[in-house]
Amino acid sequence: MGSPPELKIPVPVRILVSSLSSKIALYQKIVEGVKRINPDAVVLGADCDADCEGAKTLESKNFLVMKRLEEYSSQEICDFLSAHQISHLIPTRDGELSFWAQNRKNLKQKNIEVMVSKPNVIDLCEDKLEFYNRTKILEINSIQTESSPENIQKKTFVVKERYGSGSNTIGINLKQNEALEHAQKLKTPIFQPYIPGKEFSAETWIDRNGTSHGILLRWRTRVIEGESHESITFKNKDWEKNIKLLFESIPGLHGHCLAQVIVSSGGSLQLVEINPRLGGATPLALSAGLHSIDWFLLESMNQSHLIPETPNFQEGVQLIKKNKIVSISVSPTTPNNFH
C-alpha cells in the first residue's frame, strides 16, 4: 500500500515499540508498515533490559532504555515520551497493556497516540474466568472455565492461572486428581475441559468505532510456550464471518487484536482467549496483508477513509521460527481447512 498523494503527514513521526525484548522480526515488520505511510518516520524500540536482544540488534540511536512501567507516574511517562518526541506508541506485551490503556487519554493530550484497547476490555481479556462468563453466549462458544473441576463434565482438564498469560505454568490433559495437584502450584488457578483438536489464530485490526477490518486466519502448527513457531495462513469464509461478529460484539477493543480458537474433532469452534495486542507470530499477519501499523497511523491522522473495509489477505503464507530467527515464505501448497 503506497502513501497516497493527498496524505497529510504530521512532523515528526516517531514511533516507539515498547517491551521490545527479542521481537526483532516484529520490529522489522512494524518499520515496513510505518515507512509505507511515511518514509521519513523513525521507529524506536524500548525495553527495561538494556542487554536484551533488541538492544544488541538495533542501532543505539534507535533503542531506549526504560524503567519498569510501574515505576513511572502518569506525568513521568508523559515527560519521558515527550522528551524523546514520541508521536505513536505500540505495546507488544500482555503485562503492559493495562498501564498504557490507563494512560492513553493523558498521552493523547500530549499528541501521543497509543494503539491499545480501553482499560475495561483489557481487564476482561486478562481475567479468564470473567472472560468466559461474559463471552459464553457470543457467536463462538468460549471454552468452559471454572474455579473448580467439579463443575466440568469431562475426565481430563487444562489448568491455568486465572490472570495474565502464564503459558509456562499451564497444565494440559490432566486427570482430576492431577489437575487439583497442579493447581496447588498456581496463585489463582482456573480449570477448563481438555479439548483435543487443531488450533488457529484469528487476527484483525479494529478501528476506534469498533469495526473489524478483515479476519486473517492462520493455523498454529507448532506452538512453544504459547507462541507459534510454525504457522500458515488459510481462509474459511464462515469462520471469518463469525469471528468478525465476535470481535465487534466486545465494546472497547481497538487496534491489532487476535483470538485463539480450537477446532474440536466434531468441527465446532471453541474460543480460548482474545489478546488485544500484536502477537509473537504477528509478523506473518503483517506480511499477508493485515496492515495494522499502516492503518493505526492513518487513523491517528484522521485518514480513516484510506483504510480498506475488507482487505485481501494472502493464503498460504508461512512463518517458521527457529533458533530465534523468523523466516516468512509462501508455501508451495495451499493449507486445507480442517474437517
Task: Please report, for each region that a protein language model flagged, where it lies by residue.
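ATP-binding N-terminal substructure of ATP-dependent carboxylate-amine bond-forming enzymes
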Residues: M1-M115
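Cysteine/selenocysteine-centered motifs that mediate thiol-based redox chemistry or coordinate metal-sulfur cofactors
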Residues: S304-H339
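Short glycine-rich, flexible loops that bind phosphorylated cofactors or substrates
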Residues: L97-S98, G166, G279
